[in-house]
Amino acid sequence: MAAADTCGAGTLSSRSVASEAGQGGTSSFQRKGKASGGPGGGPRLLSIAGTRPSVRNGQLLVSTGLPALDQLLGGGLAVGTLLLIEEDKYNIYSPLLFKYFMAEGIINGHTLLVASAKENPAKILQELPAPLLDDNSKKELEDVHSAKTPEPNVNMKIAWRYQLQPKMEVGPVSSSRFGHYYDLSKRIPWELLQSSKWHGFFLPEHISPDLKGESCFLSCGYMRLLEFIQKSVYAEGFDGANPQKKQKNILRIGIQNLGSPLWGDDICCKENCDNNHRLTKFLYILRGLLRSSLSACIITMPAHLVQNKSITTRVRNLSDTVVGLESFIGSERETNPLYKDYHGLIHIRKIPRLNNLTCDESDVKDLAFKLKRKLFTIERLHLPPDLSDTVGRSSKQDLAASTARLGAGCSSMAEGKKHLDF
């Protein structure tokens, strides 16, 4: 009986609390992510410039710098994931995706880490494309990257003004939006580069000829690069274990030509090499760093040069997102009139399955890219209409000739001839 009284009292107390909450005008239900981060509250979504939560799985997303590619990847690139770009045959178009990713980080004030074994990172950043911004957005961007801290009410006024205006998908856009467009014919302003924070890893500067750092697990270049990335992640508080004291930010990592002989790897030279596991070991450790930090990584790799295709399959399995570029240069499709409006095909080989068993791959097929004077665009591949006169359509001359022959035949029938000459 006492237990029943206790149970009844608990039910009564919960009902009274619910009634008091209803009388107070507040609901006891709270939307996910809107709860406070204090004791008893739910997790609070991070508010970082240049990011937004995914509507599918709640993951924090960053833009790749190409809005069309963001749409194909489910809204953007998830923080803590790896994007692999399989280079085209002559490495003409894949560096553009790399530069888009880096330029997007500068516009949003993210920290960059550029690693290359071929070109100096400072030179790579100087060749980034300039953003397409209107006059008001340029003023806002200067306020964000200036050394002086602007007043909070001024920032709120600018953000409130532009978020109510409809945004066009082509042309200049605001710097506060997710994803921007860039002008490939212009270079990013020097003022933005000076105000941005970046780290450069140039392999020849970190390896001396007499240095013996080879191991049975990793090459010397991979070891130095992992140490450099790990130091940047931990020193500046991008890892979750050591939160940043200041406002949280995103680390964008870009690695060029990974797996090529420039990195000391021989998977592009031999089919059965003894050290074919070094690249996969590197990706294992790198993904562990990404998963536990506020960072996103893009890697370009010459997959067409890898002799053993099983290595390419393993690298794809170790990547969260895989995008391949197929150029028409030097192929039969370059002179094919069906592909005259495009410069190559883009293959979305893998889409991340984060907190899901499956992913939607319905909109990632039959894609082509086109390089214009200022823009790199991704379009749905379609065949042009057949308007030729030889296929399914007669010309006026042929039609007139057939009419004349038909008229002559009919006149001969009228004169009593039994046979018609066709």
From Swiss-Prot:
Keyword Cytoplasm: yes
Tissue distribution: Expressed throughout the cerebellum.
Record pathway: tRNA modification; 5-methoxycarbonylmethyl-2-thiouridine-tRNA biosynthesis
Keywords: Cytoplasm, Nucleus, tRNA processing
Compartments where located: Cytoplasm; Nucleus
PANTHER family xref list: ELONGATOR COMPLEX PROTEIN 4, PAX6 NEIGHBOR PROTEIN PAXNEB
Family to which this protein belongs: Belongs to the ELP4 family.
Main function: Component of the elongator complex which is required for multiple tRNA modifications, including mcm5U (5-methoxycarbonylmethyl uridine), mcm5s2U (5-methoxycarbonylmethyl-2-thiouridine), and ncm5U (5-carbamoylmethyl uridine). The elongator complex catalyzes the formation of carboxymethyluridine in the wobble base at position 34 in tRNAs.
Stated name of the protein: Elongator complex protein 4
Species name: Mus musculus (Mouse)
